[in-house]
Amino acid sequence: MPTGKRKGDVESTKFDLVLRPETITFENFRIGWFYTEARLVIKNPTKNRYTYKIKVTNNDMFDIRTPKGFIDPETSIEIELLHVPGILLPRNDVHHFSVYYIKCDTEAQNSHSIWTSKKSEGCKHVLIRFPNKIIRTQEMKKMEEDDMKQQKERNKLSNEKMGIRNQNMGEKK
């Protein structure tokens, strides 16, 4: 069973930032048909400034509005995460967002140069889930209706045959 983990993508035992929620759930009555939004809050409870980077296991299925940036001491930021429409929904807990950070000085302006020159100091995975109950699409509803019609026709034919047999049995008595 695929875990959605990248090679070398290992969670840190020590992670200085706080992530909420710990599991992202994309919920919308039109999930799969329209972009579905979820939010991740990153809180920095320390006295240090950090640069963060967020990755995901499938870039075709998910989008991150602000994948890199800075977080100042004792502040929080909210990151918008999106499920892209038109793609089948995967099983729960197969995919995840990975949040990385590096401590930086207060004057740092370019996070790209920090990420190219240093290695991540921490990594945490945020699992991705979808609602257990998915609203039926119009296509699914039509397929179900067609199946019901076919089943009724089969039952009708079967009943007619049984009726003929019952009539024949009645005549023999």
From Swiss-Prot:
Residues 141-173 are annotated as: Disordered. Residues 16-133 form the MSP domain. InterPro entries: Ig-like_fold, MSP_dom, PapD-like_sf. Residues 141-163 have a biased composition (Basic and acidic residues). It holds the Pfam family Motile_Sperm. This is Uncharacterized protein ZK688.12. It comes from Caenorhabditis elegans.
